[in-house]
Amino acid sequence: MSTTEASLYPRDGHITEEGISEHAAESTFREVDDSRRSIPAIEFRDVTMEFDGRKVLNNLSFKVNRGETKIILGGSGCGKSTTIKLVLGLLKPDEGQILVDGEDITNYSEVDIMHVRKKIGMIFQEGALFDSLSVYENVAFKLHEQGVPEEEVENEVRRMLRFVNLEDAIDKMPSELSGGMRRRVGIARALVGDPKIVMFDEPTAGLDPPTARTICELAMKLRDLEDVSSIFVTHEMNNLDYLCSEYAVVNEAGDVVFEKEGEKLCLIISKVLMMKDGQVIFSGTDEALRRAEDPYIQKFLRGH
């Protein structure tokens, strides 16, 4: 089964002869609207930004296409996290344009940007949970603020916790969770409302390899089964290996599995952007990155 055939994640595990869930219309997330696929999910056009006279970003241009994961690599201070803050409208560029879902947000006020942020899920390095709230209350926080009826809130919270394989922890407090579990709760909270764009800011930093792998698998599920567009900021090459060499499918038993066959399928929807001193020094596939002769890239690859 290809990633196209498995574009929807089944709740009940029943698969038709065509390989699609019998309840595709009731997927974990909404079905894909193809009418706007030609419009990039995110686009930077010659973006420049300075802090204290130093250019943090220098004429930065790139696109994240629909359903694509853009993996941004680079050392500390190269502008990776600044890029995410600009997408969220937390910072404004000195020059250039930033478009989200085809909408120019460059000069949006705090009020104007709010409807754009609702389209975006944000996953922080530490999960950013409220320690005084239970897992249920953390994931439900946005829904409670919006006044959603409690029955609907519970259904949505359980749906998201099932997606990250943590429904059993619904009544636990953050202090009872491991670091990896906290990150997964943070992912569940970010996915409430079915955002079609997700930002990952160093989501595996400080985690052991098996737990980091779990976080990458969740990113792959979003990319391959839910058609989510994302930016995945990292400095860890293991993340690159997972995201660029495997893809998620639903097997005949209705389980999500990760395949290595047909690697080219993954390379189409996972692209690498390497930054240095606020500029793009590489954009392409992971295979091309490993063949690059640039001394900085080679040193980065050897050090990771």
Task: Give the positions of each predicted feature.
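Conserved ABC ATPase "signature" region
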Residues: 103-104, 144, 151-169
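Short coil-to-helix segment of the ABC ATPase nucleotide-binding domain corresponding to the Q-loop/switch region
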Residues: 133-140
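Conserved ABC ATPase signature
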Residues: 173-177, 181
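A short, proline-enriched helix->beta-strand linker immediately N-terminal to the Walker B motif
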Residues: 192-196
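Catalytic Walker B motif of ABC-type/P-loop ATPase nucleotide-binding domains
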Residues: 198-201
